[in-house]
């Protein structure tokens, strides 16, 4: 339970925690950001990590004159982390996907996460790799499911790079350009919660629609 509380606190107060990391570790924070983003996109056991808000807050911190963070270097590193992470995730899904999710009672490899991602694939096809970048949890499982389904790696790689570019550039530079606005600085926590809600909302709506459609079909 302590870990759950820590994660919730870290996500909701990511601006404070990230600022503390920058103050304590300086340029080493690049490596920390790289690792967090790689784990969220590359490991199916860490779908809870806050990719969207992390990118936005990192961009906002880079805009402050009190920090030595270079937003352009940060973007390059985050792009590499996102692209390599998805590629690793795809490979894991291709090699071990069925085995990892063979236990229906698993607390870590939950079948519901795969079902949610499959719904996206049914509607959007290969473009799911791009769109999933903006939907937490689905973002982590989309490349994994692509690997399980033996999607052509050439097609996957193209979607992977496009999705990473859109996602990293949008959130990081949005934080960088809006982070200096006093109103944004004063309401950063509220904005982070808003980013999380907006990110999750499309997935929730899609699940509700799918369940209603299934209920109508059952009748």
UniProtKB/Swiss-Prot annotation:
The chain crosses the membrane at residues 25-45, 73-93, 161-181, 188-208. Residues 1-24, 94-160, 209-219 are cytoplasmic. It is a multi-pass membrane protein. The keyword Cell inner membrane applies. It is found in: Cell inner membrane. This is Protein DedA. Belongs to the DedA family. Its main location: membrane. It comes from Escherichia coli (strain K12). Keywords: Cell inner membrane, Cell membrane, Membrane, Transmembrane, Transmembrane helix. It comes from the Bacteria. InterPro entries: DedA-like, VTT_dom. Could be involved in undecaprenyl phosphate (UndP) transport and recycling. When expressed in B.subtilis uptA-ykoX double mutant, confers high-level resistance to the amphomycin derivative MX2401, which binds UndP in the outer leaflet of the cytoplasmic membrane and prevents its transport across the membrane and its recycling. GO terms for cellular component: plasma membrane. Coiled coil: none annotated. The keyword Membrane applies. Residues 46-72, 182-187 are periplasmic.
